[in-house]
């Protein structure tokens, strides 16, 4: 059952919710942050990334979660995600890039779902998996227009390479809280 994670309160580990992402390549970090600032992004947002396992909450063991992610990450090699056929998902308040799901990122997602899914509750259905990069989230309509025009100048190349995944956790509610990286996991390193 889907819930609105916006106002979840911090758990016994000090975080309201968690997600697993592949951080954007370094060359995109600054341009993506520039877009967020220009569009007026105020809601807590993770810096440029592709979501690999969607938002979840109510975990029983942070150490158990870290161990499970480490194990899964070690079993998967770095991923190339093609930009051909990419869609722009736009709403009144958000701009999201949708990528075609390839077998490698789907397998990583599926393994995370199998191993991480039972350790907490998903805020929304993760399947079917939709590989995406949120550019701005819950901004004013003029912010959407700004972000939309700026992504036209963004050079994503033919593919994005991901060599790591991050466990991110939100400290506090969405408006006023902050996302923090709890740990980075190298893909293919057991």
Question: Whereabouts are the PLM-identified features?
Answer:
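Surface-exposed, active-site-proximal loop segments in enzymatic domains
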Residues: 92-99
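Basic, often amphipathic N-terminal segments
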Residues: 1-80, 99-164, 176-190
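Short proline/glycine- and acidic-rich turn/helix-capping motifs at secondary-structure junctions
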Residues: 84-92, 131, 164-174
């Amino acid at each position: 059952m889907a819930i609105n994670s916006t106002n979840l309160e911090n758990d016994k580990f000090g975080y309201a919710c968690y997600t697993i992402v592949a951080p954007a390549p370094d060359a995109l970090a600054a341009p993506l942050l520039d877009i967020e600032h220009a569009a007026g992004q105020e809601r807590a947002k993770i810096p440029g990334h592709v979501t690999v396992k969607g938002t979840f909450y109510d975990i029983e063991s942070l150490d158990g979660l870290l161990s499970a992610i480490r194990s899964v990450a070690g079993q998967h090699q770095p991923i190339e995600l093609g930009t051909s056929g990419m869609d722009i998902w736009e709403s009144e308040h958000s701009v999201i890039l949708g990528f075609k799901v390839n077998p490698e990122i789907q397998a990583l997602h599926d393994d995370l779902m199998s191993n991480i899914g039972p350790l907490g509750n998903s805020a929304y259905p993760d399947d079917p998996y939709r590989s995406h990069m949120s550019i701005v989230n819950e901004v004013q309509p003029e912010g959407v227009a700004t972000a939309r025009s700026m992504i036209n100048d963004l050079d994503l190349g033919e593919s994005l390479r991901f060599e790591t995944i991050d466990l991110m956790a939100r400290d506090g509610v969405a408006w006023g809280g902050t996302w923090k990286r709890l740990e980075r996991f190298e893909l293919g390193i057991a």
